Curated annotation (Swiss-Prot):
Tagged with keyword Cytoplasm: yes
Primary site of residence: cytoplasm
Organism for this UniProt entry: Shewanella denitrificans (strain OS217 / ATCC BAA-1090 / DSM 15013)
GO annotation terms (biological process): DNA replication; DNA synthesis involved in DNA repair; double-strand break repair; SOS response
Protein name: DNA replication and repair protein RecF
Database matches in InterPro entries: DNA-binding_RecF, DNA-binding_RecF_CS, P-loop_NTPase, RecF/RecN/SMC_N, RecF_2
GO MF term list: ATP binding; single-stranded DNA binding
Function: The RecF protein is involved in DNA metabolism; it is required for DNA replication and normal SOS inducibility. RecF binds preferentially to single-stranded, linear DNA. It also seems to bind ATP.
Similarity comment: family membership: Belongs to the RecF family.
Subcellular location: Cytoplasm
Length: 360
């Protein structure tokens, strides 16, 4: 999987840009505010239908335009595909894959699997469980085709159940939804568990490279006591749920626990070590996708020199290039990346005031 051509129009400060990236490592450099991160953001937007920097997608549309347009031609093990996305300031979004209109943004994610390593992505360990659930669910979505439907049903049922709780409904009116919730919760949990088990096997070797002599254990918690039947728990917690107006236990409370001995990694490791652990998690996820589905991820790595020292930059870039995946890396100074590579970047782009040029 690699992007052969990328077209960006009216995205942040980029009026128009066309890139013909390499299948290997692409270095994008420029001053702060030049638009180099916007190139990565545009690629992510094309794959996810949203930004990794802002929940308000309208903000990514260039200030003097009413819509943005993104297009990419990509090659994969089944041949080639063309992906296009147009986002209007009023929120309307149009997506086409090989000329056909696509209604679900999940189809984009399936077509263009993207891994992001940015200053924001370190929230995976520094913040609450939501980011870790999203990490697990990215992998579960790509590894098992039944996950998306099951998880969509869980979210739909929880929304209905929570509305009934806020309306003060009796448990008799909620019982039907509980039976449905239990059914899909078990399916979601089984897929998540299986995915984390598979990820663990790959992760051990990568962590040994990044953090030698640090013994990290990883476990998945499903969102309720593993010894308790969810149906019985939902019934016993009805009064509590009624008081809070939402469902306290269930698959929406799942988490990925990472520990060193008896301590959470957040308490046992330095901030630099935690960043390396996040990088290891992202690389393992990409490797597992390749192993399970013969599909490469595309890696977007933003502002690497400000996040890792030279030694660890070198280690991360070595691990990334060894995956064989297409990589886009940004930096203010190209030397910060070039000096950390065993061989020169496959392609170099310079960005200045939203204009992207290739450096021969």
């Amino acid at each position: 999987m690699s992007l052969q051509r990328i077209s960006i129009e009216s995205f942040r400060n980029i009026a128009a840009a066309n890139l013909l990236p390499s299948e290997g490592l692409n270095l994008i450099y420029g001053h702060n505010g030049s638009g180099k991160t916007s190139v990565l953001e545009a690629i992510y937007f094309l794959g996810m239908g949203r930004s990794f920097r802002s929940h308000l997608s309208q903000r990514v549309i260039r200030h003097d335009e009413d819509k943005l347009t993104l297009f990419a031609q990509l090659s994969h093990h089944n041949g080639e595909s063309k992906v296009g996305l147009r986002r209007h300031r009023n929120g309307e979004i149009e997506v086409k894959i090989d000329g056909d209109r696509v209604k679900r943004l999940s189809t984009l994610a399936e077509t263009l699997p993207i891994q992001v390593i940015t200053p924001e992505s370190f929230s995976l360990l520094f913040e609450g469980p939501k980011a870790r659930r999203q990490f697990v669910d990215w992998g579960a979505f790509h590894s098992d085709e039944q996950f998306y439907t099951a998880w969509s049903n869980v979210k739909r049922i929880l929304k209905q159940r929570n509305q009934l709780l806020r309306n003060g409904s009796s448990y008799g009116n909620i019982l039907f939804w509980d039976k449905e919730l239990v059914r899909y919760a078990e399916q979601v949990t089984q897929i998540r568990n299986h995915y984390v088990d598979s990820l663990n096997e790959l992760l051990k070797g990568i962590i040994e490279e990044f953090l030698p002599q640090v013994n990290i254990s990883i476990s998945f918690t499903r969102g309720w006591d593993s010894k308790t039947d969810l149906a019985l728990l939902l019934e016993s917690q009805y009064s509590r749920d009624l008081a809070t107006g939402h469902t306290v236990s269930g698959p929406h409370k799942a988490d990925l626990r990472l520990r060193v001995g008896n301590l959470p990694v957040q308490d046992a490791l330095s901030r630099g070590q935690l960043k390396l652990l996040v990088c290891a998690l992202r690389i393992a996820q990409g490797k597992l996708l390749k192993q399970q589905k013969d599909k490469q991820s595309i890696y977007l790595v933003d502002d690497l020199p400000s996040e890792l020292d030279a030694q660890h930059r070198q280690l991360l870039l070595k691990q990334l290039t060894e995956t064989g995946a297409q990589i886009f890396v940004t930096a203010i100074e190209p030397a910060a990346i070039v000096d950390s590579l065993a061989s020169p970047p496959n392609k170099v782009f310079h960005v200045e005031q939203g204009r992207v040029t290739v450096i021969e």
